[in-house]
Amino acid sequence: MDNKLEKMKELVEELNQYAYEYYVLDNPSISDKEYDLKYDELVILEKKTEVTLPYSPTQRVGDKILGEFSKYTHKGRLWSLDKAQNMEQLIEWHNRNLKVIEQYNSMSEDKLPELRYIVTKKFDGLTVNCTYDENGILIKSATRGTGIIGEDITAQIKTIKTVPLKIKNSYVIEVHGEAIMTKTAFEEYNKAAQVPLKNLRNGAAGALRNLDIKETARRNLSAFFYDVGYNEGPEFKSYREMMNFIRNMGLPQDKYIKECTNMEEVEKEIEYIESIRGELDYDIDGAVIVVDDIKTREILGYTIKFPKWAIAYKFEAKEITTKLLDVEWNVGRSGRVTPTALLEPVELGGVTVKRATLNNMDDIKRKNVKLGAKVLVRRSNDVIPEIMGVVEESLEESEEIQAPDRCPYCNSHLVQNGVHYYCENTLSCKPQMVKSIVHFASREAMNIAGFSEKTAEQLFEKLDIKSIADLYKIKKEELLTLEKFKDKKSQNLIDAIQNSKNCDLASFIYALGIPNVGKKTANDLVMKFKTLESIKNTTIEQLVEVPDVGEIVAKSIYDFFEDEKIISNIEELLNLGVKPYYEEERIDENPFMDKTIVVTGSLNNYSRGEIKDKLQSLGAKVSSSVSKNTDYVLVGEKPGSKYEKAIELGVKVINEEEFSNKIK
């Protein structure tokens, strides 16, 4: 037993070091295959010994659903930062600091040093506090909360691969950081999500406040650490020293840290950060300027809310205040009834905004949003604007938003499930049926060419199409009665419907509209179970073994195929001649098979999604970062830092023309 435990400790130390090299340093020393072999060996030993070390990498898997969030009292307070909107306000802050230091030095023999500032980026994510004990083990992680009391998110933080579960430290510390979702992770998640995320910040916040840990893991969060908020070890003399300590502990840290001795230098760095803002793989909303010397910080002190020795310079945000005129309730394909805010039109980021997202009634109540009130609207990453909060002073003459009790379209009684309201009238509720038909016919589903929402509406209203199976019963002469349907268009649609009967199984599964199942999950299900019959009869336990399928998604799939009406509809589709098929994909030998490839820059003949699909069809592994284990970097126009990293590491670089020649 002792030998096995020693071997486990050895494997855990090795695997954590390899993970640090891979995720933090971006410079792995072993191959993925070697890592997987050691990881599998550790899993076997943990099962045999029934012992799992608290800092074992197997604790990152995230395969449980928690009951609720518990409170955690921070050992050291998490302060908010005062904000400057322009250089004049920043200079005022600087002059106040100078005045306090001059007064102190005039009365004290122990002089404070020349004022020196450290400038860093201000990340637009969710503040987190991680506690490591005297053995260096991560024992607690929590949200900021009030700054004094937060919520325990330890299990969620452990899914972030860059956050070490153990550090080489012998006293209790709390480190503050920002959990973020990168643009790369955001795009990857949305490819497979039935309900796409709206922006990076919500992606991170929603992941950390999700009780389904596997869903948190799916979002592939990252983190940057920038402060030691509580420390039972030797005191730091400067912020530089503190940041070096954080880095030496193996905690992920942004490389950009600049020292400035005057406001001209600070302004130059702020301008630089703003200039690279759009190139970053994550969101920032400003710069943070802090006093470097710790003793000077102590002399400057705090207000009730903020430290006087730090300030955030906020970039011009894509946010604005306007009036909430009304709330419109819309019905989606799943029957979910969701609110949309109707706003007094306002210009935001070069666009006239009239509507904004309100996720559900819980969201409305939490943000205290009311009719007639002034609301703060944010537009991130060019997606649908979202209401972030309300102007408190505008609430006096406002009205409460009432949740509907009937469907706004078919007048059926709504049922509440969790935070959402649903219309269960799937047969005659127009928005549900129309959106279901459009989804079924879409390119990634059954690929019925020439099918639009307008066509679906006519089929529902004039041809009484009440189920997906009814599509395969439509006759040409019926289509000729519809608006703008002549002979050729009618025949083309009939042909397209008939041609769709021979479809691949993954497209059919996706077309069925299973809640929480996107095209990627549909593909993964087919890869795992091979046949429609197997997928229909699988268990929740088997479903969670599918990559990226957690308890919630597994239950959605299981419940879907338990519904007798759905099974009846599927049987009717099969009886009408729909024949989903699955063929094991065979990949011909090619130069990119089993190679790791990174893509950077814009390509002429492929979008980012298309080139990824193409490479994967060639048997290649597509990575988002360059390391010495990368085989090729495919470079397009205006490549980013990945190109420079490839040159630095001596990785083979090819352009689009060379790529095309290699696959001819």
UniProtKB/Swiss-Prot annotation:
List of catalytic residues: K122 (n6-amp-lysine intermediate)
Coiled coil start-end: none
Gene3D superfamilies, A to Z: 5' to 3' exonuclease, C-terminal subdomain, BRCT domain, DNA ligase/mRNA capping enzyme, Helix hairpin bin, Nucleic acid-binding proteins
Protein EC: 6.5.1.2
Any Gene Ontology CC annotation: cytosol
Residues that, per the record, bind Zn(2+): C407, C410, C423, C429
GO BP terms: DNA repair; DNA replication
InterPro entries in the record: BRCT_dom, BRCT_dom_sf, DisA/LigA_HHH, DNA_ligase, DNA_ligase_CS, DNAligase_adenylation, DNAligase_N, Hlx-hairpin-Hlx_DNA-bd_motif
Single Gene Ontology MF annotation: metal ion binding
Residue ranges occupied by any BRCT domain in the UniProt entry: 587-664
Binding locations of NAD(+): D32, K33, E34, Y35, D36, S80, L81, R144, E178, K314
UniProt keyword annotations, A-Z: DNA damage, DNA repair, DNA replication, Ligase, Magnesium, Manganese, Metal-binding, NAD, Zinc
Disulfide topology: none
Known catalytic reactions: NAD(+) + (deoxyribonucleotide)n-3'-hydroxyl + 5'-phospho-(deoxyribonucleotide)m = (deoxyribonucleotide)n+m + AMP + beta-nicotinamide D-nucleotide
SUPFAM superfamilies for the chain: BRCT domain, DNA ligase/mRNA capping enzyme, catalytic domain, Nucleic acid-binding proteins, RuvA domain 2-like
Family: Belongs to the NAD-dependent DNA ligase family. LigA subfamily.
Annotated PANTHER family: CHROMOSOME TRANSMISSION FIDELITY FACTOR 18, DNA LIGASE
The protein's name: DNA ligase
